[in-house]
Amino acid sequence: MTARDIVESYGRAIPPDGKPEYFRLHRYRFRALLAALPPAPARVLEIGTTPGQFTAILRRASYAVAGVDLFPEQRADLWRSLGVEVRFCNLDEQPLPYTDAQFDAVVFSEVIEHLSGSPLPALQEMARVLRPGGRLVLTTPNQLYIKSRLRTLADILLGRPFEPFDEFTRSMRLHGPQRYYNHSRLYTMRELRWLIEQSGLEVGLARYGDAWEQVGIEAGRLLRHPLRVAAKAGLWLLTSAFPAWRSMLLIVGQKPE
């Protein structure tokens, strides 16, 4: 089965209480991640497992999976049902709770932008637990995503704050692990390349992904939301012509043999 087949087979099996809307929003990211991994049954460490959909996809694809998360207890029943041990770890403050060279791959998807400190120590930890030849597969929102840039330009022209006041007050009240709910900063591809190299890995694949542009332009939504689909399709065509404006960065770092 292809990465697409595996992801879509999982999507068809999601029960109503299994966050189907989350899957709809993230399915294209899941496909890109799965396609970038070494073949199963490689041993994979997933960093930031909640809500567990990609964890389940990895198991469906026959990978041996371990995970770390800030709140492993919140989905403990799911981890047991999948046969996956998920340990607590705060990457800003702690080393990964594993010995050297344990994993064939590390998945670090949509997490780096939430770290409050420099991500370099965490990336060096990921390099440490990889076996020689192992891969770090990382995705994060693109700082140069054209939709975000246009929104910022509109805010400037209209004299609006970049962050609505109610969002500001919510952010200011976050404390402890809750502070990681927000994005601390976004990255460019050049910055990610530098971070990967400084962590001791070699950059393999480095690609601008359109995971978010594809959401909402599925054929089944055209009759229900024609104007919205047309607008999103236009954005997708624009970023297809200018890949550096796409929504997602995907980079693979490989540990030297």
Spans of features found by a protein language model:
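Conserved SAM-binding motif I beta-strand of class I
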Residues: 64-69
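A structural alpha-helix within SAM-dependent methyltransferase catalytic domains
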Residues: 34, 59, 123-127
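Conserved class I S-adenosyl-L-methionine
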Residues: 41-50
